[in-house]
């Protein structure tokens, strides 16, 4: 359907659908529209009109003053000066004015109204303002004559480009505007002919094409005679004449020219070399003077070929910056044509340019391919030199500057880059385009005698050269010079001295630049005079050494003499002196037989001049080493004919070849064919014995014959031995022997029989087809672009037996083994069996190769899906999803379905798709695509369109839909993975949610989503089709993502009453401004959002009236105008449309429309109010909290707009309570500056019939719309329906008002809970708590339940309880309470008690439980905010974090928590089946995080999901270790026992997953490895139908308990990730650009919903890099407010790491600071051990052991063995405060200081070592040496003489924590020093830091703990960093695994003198308990710290770092059984520690 027909149909539809329009608004105009008075204000291109009274952005004189009767109101379309139709100036600065998008009224309308008489004020503007006066006769699709009378609406050029509007200057500035051509009909962008050229044309929207003729045809004769074109007299053009177009008719395209082409007026614009012409009016890229202004009669239009200055032929300047101008590729017309047209007389304006612009004046006699004499008369067009180089244009100075220009040689024919001889040298020549070769002779031959007598060369008198004499060439003829030679040229004695490439010969007697032995002394008879060409050693022809240092020698540019000449002169006898040079100087001896285009045999005898390879590359010269260095030179192969760059075969390979000029391709065979047999028998190839190759064997080429190119292969191609070397994507193959760019093992050494020669396609390891590694670093390998041979060929050759050397590469190198069955263009079923070669998506994108990770990293590779046919980039379905798909080459679109269709039924039954068992996907489920079929295209939808499965993808505004699987340009959660049944295929319109109609996200970044341009199916269709059941994944995206659910009523162009019910799609204001989207905050911030006004229809940017304004309005897109009323009219009020509304007519507000008020009068004074209180006129002035009201007329303390001016009927008297804007009750602003407003303390009057008022349904700022019932003193159900007025909590506290933020800030307001009845401070239950509650007025108690009781449950109450559906809260879940009802008292619990909801609140020792919402006496994080589904109500016993049973914090300050006094319920069948499903917190963001749960079988050898249901008998870990029995405590003590986990199947030692780990695991029987994952795989999807067991997914604990689930190793060091990084649990927190990550639980600077609560299983700890939503790699939000998120600077782990989970290894992470102290010093540098050996002045240091030049005796190595006095290195043996020094080598200066910088600290977090600790369970006594620097906070406390006596812990750069008893020997700080970063106790490493102690602080209550302040801060490195302090009063849970370290007594065990570690368990408080101390050890074994470790650390791992929980204090002996070690409890002293550090 044509565009115009669509427009007409749409207009008809709107006319029939819309109700009768107002008589004010006109949507059509009569005549020329002078009488039009409508309110339309949009132009034909959609631009908004500028107001007539405004001068911005366009100055004009069409104002009401100048045109008082023209109706110039606002920005409405008008016609003040009688042009063709109504128009306006636009708001777009780039477009001055346009006609309006209005149509003429029909005749019936036209006769009814006579346009008024309009007498405009005379125009005060220039005539450029005039517009055309003719009528619009309709649309014409052909034109008469030359089209000047054409007034159609066509706007497309002959090349399909869109026309630019005539009034627009973008992209082309011009003068064909309506102002200058008022009668030319220049409306919009329609094709016109304003200046009488050949046909209608227009300027184009393409910046690169100025104008083109339109794609219109001339009308037929019948049409042509019917209409006489009007007389058009255009206003004289005010533009430069350059705009003038040719005046002749358009007779067709002229492809030839007459004479010299001055009369040519065709449209050709291409030069002889194919370059595009530059426009004559353009100065880019070449500035010139041939412009239309200077040559007005030369027809210089656009970039057409012309001849303005009478040169030889039409020419033009080119678009190529390197070529100024060229002749055009036109031919002269034949004589018949030539006589028919006499060229016009052209008198050009004299040129204003330099004479260099002049072109030659001679005629173009045709192309000559030979020349006469020396070629001075040659005027052909040849432009290639003898070596194949392209000539430089004579007028160009690039790349060679010269003086042979047309200006200096005007008669030499220097046109373009044609070969010429301007200065009478030997033959035509030219400068070359090659910067390395200045000039060469051209590859032309002399004409024969017959030709020579026919043409007498002209007399050429060149202008004297202005160049340096070096440029001069000989001008005389050379009479005595021989220009040819006889035989091989040994007798040649001429004076020629130039080589074939134009180089000058070196003199034979000179050794510069080349040293040689061909001198006159050694060859006295060879005529070696000067630098003349000679042949002293009988090679093929005369040659010489060259003056070019890069080219040693070349043959001379001489030809052999003819036979006639040959008989006249007998060559002399030449006996050369034997050569003294190496044979490399030898040159070939054979004759030059001419040019051959085929070769015999293998081509060794070929002596032709062909120099192009099979791929079209140019050959490198054999004597050149650029770009490839080689040994096939004329010196080494003198008989091989290695002349210039001709194809040769010097070493007997398959065919002639050459090295190429392409640096990326070393060599290739030449594009030559073998000669036929007839030719082959005629010439016997000579015997060639080449000099042995001096190159490495890598240079060798294949030795087999070249039987022709094999372009197909047999079988799988193992026998293929062809020479093809290109992949299916066109990439060049990498040589098999090369390791660049890809290292591999498919080399000739390992596969000797596989034919791995050069880079030819091969199949060494029997994959599907020949392949190769590619030269592209981003693509490792691809199949080759070869096809299988036909059957006939296949039976003829048996592939050879190939036994490759076993592959040395990883299996990832393997390729699929299936055959290629041919090309399929349709697929069966879901396309799993498809094996075709299609590789294009539905949007036309090219597929990414499956084996490539660029641009998208993924796991669908041939390695993981070996049977899925993942060859090259062909469309496949490995998963399976709905249809074949692929990843795309477009970085912004990850994947799309392929543009394939399903095969027909006949085809479908013929092929059964194969059984495909893919390797389980290693990617996130977000990769999955929908599984439904494509049912065909539907162009209408049923109901709300949920069942629509058509293929439409255009929105109502014409935008293209974004693909559902794409996140560009809009990120979203409506993906096929989360809505698998919604049919989200490609970018088709769908309704997954469901909303009102099908919709989609758009590809326009500025418009997020729109409804699709679809209509609802007719009733007949509706009844015929039942939409399918659609089960939607619940949308968890932000509430503003939801669209309206009401039916689309169509387009409304009028509104009823105040427009509150208006749901149309109009979005323009009365001044023509575009509306801002309601959900957008740009450019205006506001609160009228869909979240706050969910029932107001705030969809997109449509006009609405959410708050009872007088009419629909919107915020505008103009930053300077906040809001305006919309350009809508009221609908005619009929009986059916009457609504009961208030009579509210306020004055228009200039601010947000919420400021409006009703107009009713005050009825008197009252103490209660009716309805919502809008009619209240009492004198009450106190709020619900007792605050006094602010006067309405006052702006203090709160500025506002509720004044009598804006609300004259609102009764705003004094400070009385009022309700001016339809709130839920009267209110006022308060006198309290901290509380803006509150509801008043008034009650509703008793509801009687007379008191019922009709109120508006809209609410301004907030509040629900339901009426308040009477007072209730009990509640039904959970109390959500309670609307009573009770406001006291269970403890008697008064409730806080819901609208108040004092004393507690919250979000339970009427905006977020409009249906929650949140009136005043009444008890309510807005969020489905277990009963009504409220915030309290007590600042110390945030909220409590109300003192209400449940109503008796009777039938009547059950039936009358209203249904209240609260709006979901958009606040953080911190406020949420459990939603389940209390089931009564439970005295037992099931499983681990996570489902327990009883009311017991007593521990096993009888202590009372602390309330979960309280922080007294124990601060904690088990609050409803973080555990919303854990039932954390009051102080009831619960198990929020998967402990072994319910527990609670206690009210006893000395006991942090205990298990509750509950027993486990008996395990019966019913109890197992009724175990509730505990689901995690549903994400309030996009549902992309949710994945479908897998089914679980009962017993199997694979596991489903995370393996919690696995009941198999596997008992081996991934590393082959045997599992420990679950009921055993040896070798690992644990709490995962059958008693504690009765439902987890903990039988024997079988692999299980009792606590929601990643997969089944077990404790191992290896004492050094606590646990590992089991060696199991996930079950395939086909097994997913087995019965599912109850799913218990607890929210993970945010606080460590004793048995943290073993879901990962302690994530201290992990700098790489596996797969896409979803499993990454390292601690890296820096992005690729170096930005720091934002904490996942923080909302600053970026608000988000990727929180630990919403993604409990994704490890969102602190600010560590993670991948919670299956992106391509770990990422994080950044701390940079301007950058929301970035990928992290992490790399993927190696393949070996990706296949198994290896035991923890020691990964040394490079320090981010200095690597050691070698390059810098700590403190005063006393410990400096670097190698600096010069002083600050640069003087060398004297060696410390030397006595010269300075004698010394104090500081020598023998007496200062600890000072490191090595060699002459700078040292500080005496602790000089100025730093290291040395004795100098200057005899006058004894010593000087060295310039050594201080070391800088690196940035490391506390408690996170950069080396993974060993965590060995042995004891220090038993000997477990720690990994060096894995406990970097360990301190060695020493005496000032260096003896170690105690340990300590670094807790900040300046502070060390140790035991107080370590400091009893001395109270002086100078007695002590500390050693940091040491691993050895005695032989200290060079990087250790030695720091003095400056102050001591003992704990004041005599606890065994003390603080040391260091004399300077320690430098934080990867070897020295602090441990973390615990939270104050934190209680370590019993059985927590902790670690002690130290160098203490080891009682003779292994590792003495090295830092040791040991693992201990914290002992229960009942066994060993004191509030100042904790106890820890293995009670049954000898593991303890000994005396030497006093003061050392006891650290426990929590979440992601090590916390210092204890300081080693004392114990009974050393590692005695049942005698635990005692440690000072650090958490008890944290307040004291922090105070000391802060105050000192």
From Swiss-Prot:
Region (Disordered): 1147-1166, 1365-1388, 1476-1497
Sequence ranges assigned to domain Peptidase S1 in this UniProt record: 1820-2038
Sample GO molecular function, one term: serine-type endopeptidase activity
Enzyme class: hydrolase
Cited SMART domains: KR, Tryp_SPc
Keywords linked to the UniProt accession: Atherosclerosis, Autocatalytic cleavage, Disulfide bond, Glycoprotein, Hydrolase, Kringle, Lipid transport, Protease, Repeat, Serine protease, Signal, Transport
Domain Kringle: 27-105, 141-219, 255-333, 369-447, 483-561, 597-675, 711-789, 825-903, 939-1017, 1053-1131, 1167-1245, 1273-1351, 1387-1465, 1501-1579, 1615-1693, 1719-1799
Post-translational modification: N- and O-glycosylated. The N-glycans are complex biantennary structures present in either a mono- or disialylated state. The O-glycans are mostly (80%) represented by the monosialylated core type I structure, NeuNAcalpha2-3Galbeta1-3GalNAc, with smaller amounts of disialylated and non-sialylated O-glycans also detected.
Signal peptide (UniProt feature, chain positions): 1-19
CDD domains: KR, Tryp_SPc
Glycosylation site list: 61, 101, 215, 329, 443, 557, 671, 785, 899, 1013, 1127, 1241, 1347, 1381, 1461, 1575, 1689
PANTHER family associated with the record: LIPOPROTEIN(A), PLASMINOGEN-RELATED
Described purpose of this protein according to its UniProt entry: Apo(a) is the main constituent of lipoprotein(a) (Lp(a)). It has serine proteinase activity and is able of autoproteolysis. Inhibits tissue-type plasminogen activator 1. Lp(a) may be a ligand for megalin/Gp 330.
Further facts: Apo(a) is known to be proteolytically cleaved, leading to the formation of the so-called mini-Lp(a). Apo(a) fragments accumulate in atherosclerotic lesions, where they may promote thrombogenesis. O-glycosylation may limit the extent of proteolytic fragmentation. Homology with plasminogen kringles IV and V is thought to underlie the atherogenicity of the protein, because the fragments are competing with plasminogen for fibrin(ogen) binding.
Subunit record text: Disulfide-linked to apo-B100. Binds to fibronectin and decorin.
Protein's name according to its UniProt entry: Apolipoprotein(a)
């Amino acid at each position: 359907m044509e565009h115009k027909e669509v427009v007409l149909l749409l207009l008809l539809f709107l006319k029939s659908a819309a109700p009768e329009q107002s008589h004010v608004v006109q949507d059509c105009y009569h005549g020329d529209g002078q009488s039009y008075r409508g309110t339309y204000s949009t132009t034909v291109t959609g631009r908004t009109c500028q107001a007539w009274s405004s001068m911005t952005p366009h100055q004009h004189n069409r104002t009401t003053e100048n045109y008082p009767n023209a109706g110039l109101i606002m920005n409405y379309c008008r016609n003040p000066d009688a042009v063709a139709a109504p128009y306006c100036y636009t708001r777009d600065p780039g477009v001055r004015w346009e006609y309006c998008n209005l149509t003429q009224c029909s005749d019936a309308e036209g006769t009814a109204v006579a346009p008024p008489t309009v007498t405009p004020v005379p125009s005060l503007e220039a005539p450029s303002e005039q517009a055309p006066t003719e009528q619009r006769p309709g649309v014409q699709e052909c034109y008469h004559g030359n089209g000047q009378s054409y007034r159609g609406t066509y706007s497309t050029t002959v090349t399909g480009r869109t026309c630019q509007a005539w009034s627009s200057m973008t992209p082309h500035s011009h003068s064909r505007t309506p102002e200058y051509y008022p009668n030319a009909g220049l409306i919009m962008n329609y094709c016109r002919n304003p200046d009488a050229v050949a046909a209608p044309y227009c300027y184009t929207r393409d910046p690169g094409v100025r104008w083109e003729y339109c794609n219109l045809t001339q009308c037929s004769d019948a049409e042509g005679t019917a209409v006489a074109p009007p007389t058009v007299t255009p206003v004289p053009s005010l533009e430069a004449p350059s705009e003038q177009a040719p005046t002749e008719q358009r007779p067709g395209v002229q492809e030839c020219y007459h004479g010299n082409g001055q009369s040519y007026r065709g449209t050709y614009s291409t030069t002889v070399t194919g370059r595009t012409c530059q426009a004559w009016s353009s100065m880019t890229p070449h500035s010139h003077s041939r412009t239309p202004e200077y040559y007005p009669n030369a027809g210089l239009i656009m970039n057409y070929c012309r001849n303005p200055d009478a040169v030889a032929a039409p020419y033009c300047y080119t678009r190529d910056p390197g070529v100024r101008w060229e002749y055009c590729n036109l031919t002269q017309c034949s004589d018949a044509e030539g006589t028919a047209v006499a060229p016009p007389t052209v008198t050009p304006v004299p040129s204003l340019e330099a004479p260099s612009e002049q072109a030659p004046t001679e005629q173009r006699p045709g192309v000559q391919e030979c020349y006469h004499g020396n070629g001075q008369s040659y005027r052909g067009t040849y432009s290639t030199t003898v070596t194949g180089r392209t000539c430089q244009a004579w007028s160009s100075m690039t790349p060679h500057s010269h003086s042979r220009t047309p200006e200096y040689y005007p008669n030499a024919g220097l046109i373009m880059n044609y070969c010429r001889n301007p200065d009478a040298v030997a033959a035509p020549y030219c400068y070359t385009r090659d910067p390395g070769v200045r000039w060469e002779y051209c590859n032309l031959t002399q004409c024969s005698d017959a030709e020579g007598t026919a043409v007498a060369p002209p007399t050429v008198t060149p202008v004297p050269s202005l160049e340096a004499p070096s440029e001069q060439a000989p001008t005389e003829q050379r009479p005595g010079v021989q220009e040819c030679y006889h035989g091989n040229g040994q007798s040649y004695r001429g004076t020629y001295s130039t080589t074939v490439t134009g180089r000058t010969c070196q003199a034979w007697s000179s050794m510069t630049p080349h040293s040689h032995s061909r001198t006159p002394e050694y060859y006295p008879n060879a005529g070696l005079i000067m630098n003349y060409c000679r042949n002293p050693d009988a090679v093929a022809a005369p040659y010489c050494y060259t003056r070019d240092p890069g080219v040693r020698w070349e043959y001379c540019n001489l030809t052999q003499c003819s036979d006639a000449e040959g008989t006249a002169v007998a060559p002399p006898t030449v006996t050369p002196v034997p050569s003294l040079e190496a044979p490399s100087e030898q040159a070939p001896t054979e004759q030059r037989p001419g040019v051959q285009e085929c070769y015999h045999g293998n081509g060794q005898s070929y002596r032709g001049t062909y120099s192009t390879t099979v791929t079209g590359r140019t050959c490198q010269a054999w004597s050149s080493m650029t770009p490839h260095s080689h040994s096939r030179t004329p010196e080494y192969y003198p008989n091989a004919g290695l002349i210039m760059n001709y194809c040769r075969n010097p070493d007997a390979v398959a065919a002639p070849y050459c090295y190429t000029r392409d640096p990326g391709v070393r060599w290739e065979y030449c594009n030559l064919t073998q000669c036929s047999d007839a030719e082959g028998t005629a010439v016997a190839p000579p015997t060639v014995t080449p000099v042995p190759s001096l190159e490495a064997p890598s240079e060798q080429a294949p030795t087999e014959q070249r039987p022709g190119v094999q372009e197909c292969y047999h079988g799988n191609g193992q026998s293929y031995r062809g020479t093809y070397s290109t992949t299916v994507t066109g990439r060049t193959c990498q040589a098999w022997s090369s390791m660049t760019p890809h290292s591999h093992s498919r080399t000739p050494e390992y596969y000797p029989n596989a034919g791995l020669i050069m880079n030819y396609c091969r199949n060494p390891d029997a994959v599907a087809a020949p392949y190769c590694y590619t030269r592209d670093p981003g693509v490792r390998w691809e199949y080759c672009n070869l096809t299988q041979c036909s059957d006939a060929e296949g039976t003829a050759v048996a592939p050879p037996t190939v036994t490759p050397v076993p592959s040395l590469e990883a299996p990832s190198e393997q390729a699929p083994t299936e055959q290629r069955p041919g090309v399929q263009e349709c697929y069966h079923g879901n396309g799993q069996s498809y094996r075709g070669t299609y590789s294009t998506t539905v949007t036309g994108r090219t597929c990414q190769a499956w084996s490539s990770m660029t641009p998208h990293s993924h796991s669908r590779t041939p390695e993981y899906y070996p049977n899925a046919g993942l060859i090259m980039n062909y469309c496949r379905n490995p998963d399976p999803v709905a249809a074949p798909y692929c990843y795309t080459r477009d970085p912004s679109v990850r994947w799309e379905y392929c543009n394939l269709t399903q095969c027909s039924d006949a085809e479908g039954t013929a092929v059964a798709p194969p059984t495909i068992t893919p390797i389980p996907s290693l990617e996130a489920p977000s990769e999955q695509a929908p599984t439904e079929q494509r049912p065909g295209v539907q162009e209408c939808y049923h109901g709300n369109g949920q069942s629509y499965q058509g293929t439409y993808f255009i929105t109502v505004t014409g935008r293209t839909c974004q693909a559902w699987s794409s996140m560009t340009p809009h990120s979203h959660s409506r993906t096929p993975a989360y809505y698998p049944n919604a049919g989200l295929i490609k970018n088709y319109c769908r309704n997954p949610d469901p909303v009102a109609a099908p919709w989609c996200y758009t590809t326009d970044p500025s418009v997020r989503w729109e409804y699709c341009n679809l209509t609802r199916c007719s009733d007949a269709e509706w009844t015929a089709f039942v939409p399918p059941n659609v089960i939607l994944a619940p949308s968890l995206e932000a509430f503003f993502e939801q669209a309206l659910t009401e039916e689309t009523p169509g387009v409304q162009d009028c509104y009823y009453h105040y427009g509150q019910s208006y749901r149309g799609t109009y979005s323009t204001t009365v001044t023509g401004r575009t509306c801002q989207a309601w959900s957008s905050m740009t450019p205006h911030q506001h609160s009228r959002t869909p979240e706050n006004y969910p029932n107001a229809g705030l969809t997109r940017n449509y006009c609405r009236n959410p708050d009872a304004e007088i009419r629909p309005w919107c915020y505008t897109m103009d930053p300077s105008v906040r809001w305006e009323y919309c350009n809508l009219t009221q609908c005619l009020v009929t009986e059916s449309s009457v609504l009961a509304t208030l009579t509210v007519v306020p004055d228009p507000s200039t601010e947000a429309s919420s400021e409006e008020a009703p107009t009713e009068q005050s009825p008197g004074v009252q103490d209660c109010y009716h309805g919502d209180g809008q009619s209240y006129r009492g004198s009450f002035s106190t709020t619900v909290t007792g605050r006094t009201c602010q006067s309405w007329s006052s702006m203090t303390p709160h500025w506002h707009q509720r004044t009598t001016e804006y609300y004259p009927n609102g009764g705003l008297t004094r400070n009385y309570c009022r309700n001016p804007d339809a709130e839920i009750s009267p209110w006022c602003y308060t006198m309290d500056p901290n509380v803006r407003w509150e509801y008043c303390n008034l009650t509703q009057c008793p509801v009687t019939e007379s008191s019922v008022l009709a109120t508006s349904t809209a609410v301004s700022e907030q509040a629900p719309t339901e009426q308040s019932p009477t007072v209730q003193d009990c509640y039904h159900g959970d109390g959500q329906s309670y609307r009573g007025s009770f406001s006291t909590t269970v403890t008697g506290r008064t409730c806080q008002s819901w609208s108040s933020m004092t004393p507690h800030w919250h979000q339970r307001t009427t905006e977020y809970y409009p249906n929650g009845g949140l009136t005043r401070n009444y008890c309510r239950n807005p969020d489905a708590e277990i009963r009504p509650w409220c915030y309290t007025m007590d600042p110390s108690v945030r909220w409590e339940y109300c003192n209400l009781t449940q109503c008796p449950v009777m039938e009547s109450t059950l039936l009358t309880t209203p249904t209240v559906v609260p709006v979901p809260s958009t606040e953080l879940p911190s406020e949420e309470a459990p939603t389940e009802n209390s089931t009564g008292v439970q005295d037992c619990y099931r499983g681990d008690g996570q489902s327990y909801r009883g009311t017991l609140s007593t521990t096993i020792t009888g202590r009372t439980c602390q309330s979960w919402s309280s922080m007294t006496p124990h601060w904690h994080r088990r609050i409803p905010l973080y555990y919303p589904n854990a039932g954390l109500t009051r102080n009831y016993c619960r198990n929020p974090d998967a402990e072994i049973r319910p527990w609670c914090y206690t009210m006893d300050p000395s006991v942090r928590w205990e298990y509750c006094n509950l027993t486990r319920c008996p395990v019966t069948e019913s109890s197992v089946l009724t175990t509730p499903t505990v689901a995690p917190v549903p994400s309030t963001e996009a549902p992309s995080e949710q994945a479908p749960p897998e089914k679980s079988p009962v017993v199997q050898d694979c596991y489903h999901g995370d393996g919690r249901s696995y009941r198999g008998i596997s008992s081996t870990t991934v590393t082959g270790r045997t599992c420990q029995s679950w009921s055993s405590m040896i070798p690992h003590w644990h709490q995962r026992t059958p008693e504690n986990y009765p439902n987890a199947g903990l039988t024997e030692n079988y692999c299980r997953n009792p606590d929601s780990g990643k997969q089944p695991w077990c404790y191992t029987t290896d004492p050094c490895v606590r646990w590992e994952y089991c060696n199991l795989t996930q079950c395939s999807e086909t097994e997913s139908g087995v019965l599912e067991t109850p799913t218990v997914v607890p929210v993970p604990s945010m606080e460590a308990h004793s048995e943290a689930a073993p879901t990962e190793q302690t994530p201290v060091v992990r700098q790489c990730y596996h797969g896409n990084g979803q499993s990454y649990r390292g601690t890296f927190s820096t992005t690729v650009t170096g930005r720091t990550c934002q904490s996942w639980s923080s909302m600053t600077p970026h608000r988000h919903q990727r929180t630990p609560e919403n993604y409990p299983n994704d490890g969102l700890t602190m600010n560590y890099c993670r991948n919670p939503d299956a992106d391509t790699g770990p990422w994080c939000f950044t701390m940079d407010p301007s950058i929301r998120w970035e990928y992290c600077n992490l790399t993927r782990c190696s393949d070996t790491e990706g296949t198994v989970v290896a035991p923890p290894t020691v990964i040394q992470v490079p320090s981010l600071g200095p690597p050691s102290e070698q390059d810098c010093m700590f403190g005063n540098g006393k410990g400096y051990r670097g190698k600096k050996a010069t002083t600050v002045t640069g003087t060398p240091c004297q060696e410390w052991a030397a006595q010269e030049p300075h004698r010394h005796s104090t500081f020598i190595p023998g007496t200062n063995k600890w000072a490191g006095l090595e060699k002459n290195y700078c040292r500080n043996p005496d602790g000089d405060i100025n730093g290291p020094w040395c004795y100098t080598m200057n005899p006058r200066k004894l010593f000087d200081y060295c310039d050594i910088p201080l070391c800088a600290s690196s940035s490391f977090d506390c408690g996170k070592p950069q080396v993974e600790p060993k965590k060995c369970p042995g004891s220090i006594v038993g000997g477990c040496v720690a990994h060096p620097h894995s406990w970097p906070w360990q301190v060695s406390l020493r005496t000032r003489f260096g003896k170690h006596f105690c340990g300590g812990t670094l807790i900040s750069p300046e502070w060390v924590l140790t035991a107080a008893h370590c400091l009893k020997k001395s109270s002086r700080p100078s007695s002590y020093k500390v050693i940091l970063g040491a691993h050895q106790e005695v032989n200290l490493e060079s990087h250790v830091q030695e720091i003095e102690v400056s102050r001591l602080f003992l704990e004041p209550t005599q606890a065994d703990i003390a603080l040391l302040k260091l004399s300077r801060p320690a430098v934080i490195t990867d070897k020295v960093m602090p441990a973390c302090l615990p939270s104050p009063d934190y209680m370590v849970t019993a059985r927590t695994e902790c670690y002690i370290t130290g160098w203490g007594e080891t009682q003779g065990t292994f590792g003495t003198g090295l830092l040791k570690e040991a693992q201990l368990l914290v002992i229960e408080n009942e066994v060993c308990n004191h509030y100042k101390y904790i106890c820890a050890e293995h009670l049954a074994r000898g593991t303890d710290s000994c005396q030497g470790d006093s003061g050392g650390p006891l650290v426990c791992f929590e979440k992601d770092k090590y916390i210092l929980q204890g300081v080693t204090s004392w114990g009974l002996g050393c590692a005695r059984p049942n005698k635990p070690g005692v440690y000072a409890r650090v958490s008890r002293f944290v307040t004291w520690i922090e105070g000391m550090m802060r105050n000192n």
